[in-house]
Amino acid sequence: MYKRQIYDRAGRKPDFIWYPCVDKGPDEGGANSFHCPMVTSQPETIQANMDEIFTKYGTRFLHPFLPLHHPAKLHKILKRIFRPFKISGSEIDAAQRKAEAAREEYKMQLYLETQRILQEIEEKKLIGIVLAGRPYHADPAINHSIPDLINQLGMAVLSEDGIAMMQDSKFPPLRVLNQWTWHSRLYRSADYVTRHADLELVELNSFGCGLDAVVTDQVQEIMSKRNRLYTSLKIDQSLNLGAIRIRPISYTHLRA
């Protein structure tokens, strides 16, 4: 999918395509906050495999590693990169401030919306599905509109990053080294689900990944300690949504 997107943008002959590498995410309270290698190095893979496309259209592909967790270092790197484009340091500084404000606003909106949905679940005696996945799983073309499908079954959908923000969200005892940003949120979300009977955890999984093998085992352990079900949907192995519907439907029967 990314090849099609990059090819389309290169064909429009922009000044450049901006796709930075980001190896660390926000601090989630773990031993570290790395992004997984796939997310971090995807731009490097694109550069290595699509260089002919960039040459064909004369498109510059900018994919620097950016330390988003270190604003001062980030500012220096951005000044150097955008100097040829006549973008001043003050403009970059203003852009950084706006970006940070936008991120904080998004986090607040996510927190408030998650609280609202949790309250609605409690008041209306609904089933809530905490739908966990990688950032790219937010794309309907990748998630096969599974969130909509769950809604159609009369269940609420929440994201693991929203659940991880809740005040009583915490890390359970872990056997693994907790150093990956997304995994950290998933562990906390799994523990939260085990302590709330009206919630269930469903993870979207798109490819065989060594890191996912580790996190799957750990989350399974967290859930099983309180006799809770853990569902991992390998959505790239089948487009049969009928089969995917079975597990969410089973939750309604278990509570009947």
Describe the residue ranges of each PLM region.
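Glycine-rich, anion-gripping cofactor-binding loops and their flanking helix/strand elements
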Residues: 3-11, 164-211
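Glycine-rich phosphate/diphosphate-binding loops that line cofactor/substrate pockets in enzymes
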Residues: 9-13, 117-127, 193-197
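A charged, amphipathic alpha-helical module
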Residues: 65-166
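Conserved small/polar residues in nucleotide/adenosyl-binding loops
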Residues: 1-5, 252-256
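Acidic/glycine-enriched edge-of-secondary-structure segments
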Residues: 30-33, 95-107, 162-184, 239-241
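Short glycine/threonine-rich loop-to-helix capping motif typified by GTGT followed
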Residues: 138-145, 171-180, 215-217
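Peripheral docking tails and interdomain loops at the edges
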Residues: 20-24, 29-85, 194, 203-255
